[in-house]
């Protein structure tokens, strides 16, 4: 039984398959007891609910928003000029407390802009980040940033690590998350000026920092929080999505190639279906924002009803974890950590002790 908490606001007009697939996903979640605020043009959404034969007993309420942010709209301008757009209205519902979280498969830049404009950032947060929860061999790992900040400074990576550790602990449920920076090797000498500066600071942070990890470690589960800039993170995620799709296709072709393989394929179908489900991006549903004063999830633009339903469940779980309350405290030491690292780097090395061999 779901504990009493404010509904999840769902942007019914965001995504390639809106509003039909979005409404269906919301209905599926509502049928499992999750209260929903469906946001968009009221008349159109009521028609959609009727088309999907959603009964009046379901915990779904329609909240009118008269404008829509298109995929080619400039995010900042859309938030300022289309003040009644469904993304912004979702965030206003979160800010007012009428919604516990929001989900949108719409323009991701507009979702980020709306979060900053409407919710604002916790004290001390330089830039928000987007998290991806990865299906690892051991549980789950989280990767951030996924594209919110492509040109990072050391303080951004430090804060991503601190915020990601909070999310892994409070939402994912990892008691003591291992945190690493994504680099081209595990040695301290690897990486760039950016990663080395952030790593030097994080070695003295109040978390379990394990240094660098490599791309091969993304899905092993050996590291719980993997930190990188938004450009690298986005490329890494898209590469994993593409690889999973190609590997799945290879397996299907191989199992269909001969009669013996076909029999083997039938015998292994359950295992393959389990693997496919584990790697299916729709199972994750959406990518949470961290570093704003509220819970927001960005779903893939091509999300179907399955993805939206899962995003709603995950948004609900994140809201119940109250992780946002801890973010300001987590990032508070970030400036001091960087200053301390810079001070240590500037110190001259200790003088070499004389030995009998020097004589």
UniProtKB/Swiss-Prot annotation:
Localization, UniProt: Cytoplasm
Per its UniProt record, what Pfam families does this chain match? FA_synthesis
- Which superkingdom? Bacteria
EC numbers on record: 2.3.1.274
SUPFAM superfamilies with a match to the protein in the record: Isocitrate/Isopropylmalate dehydrogenase-like
Q: In which pathway does it act?
A: Lipid metabolism; phospholipid metabolism
GO molecular function term, any single one: phosphate:acyl-[acyl carrier protein] acyltransferase activity
Identify the Gene3D superfamilies for this entry: Isopropylmalate Dehydrogenase (3.40.718.10)
Biological process terms from the Gene Ontology for this record are: fatty acid biosynthetic process; phospholipid biosynthetic process
User: Record's Gene Ontology CC terms?
Assistant: cytoplasm
Catalyses which reaction(s): a fatty acyl-[ACP] + phosphate = an acyl phosphate + holo-[ACP]
Q: What keywords appear on the UniProt entry?
A: Cytoplasm, Lipid biosynthesis, Lipid metabolism, Phospholipid biosynthesis, Phospholipid metabolism, Transferase
Disordered: where is this region? Answer: 338-359
- Which top EC class is given? transferase
Describe the family membership recorded for this protein in Swiss-Prot or TrEMBL: Belongs to the PlsX family.
Q: What does this chain do?
A: Catalyzes the reversible formation of acyl-phosphate (acyl-PO(4)) from acyl-[acyl-carrier-protein] (acyl-ACP). This enzyme utilizes acyl-ACP as fatty acyl donor, but not acyl-CoA.
Q: Which NCBIfam families match?
A: plsX
> HAMAP family of this UniProt entry?
PlsX
Self-association state and partner proteins as the record states: Homodimer. Probably interacts with PlsY.
| Protein name stated in the entry | Phosphate acyltransferase
Species the sequence originates in: Anaeromyxobacter sp. (strain Fw109-5)
Gene that encodes the chain: plsX
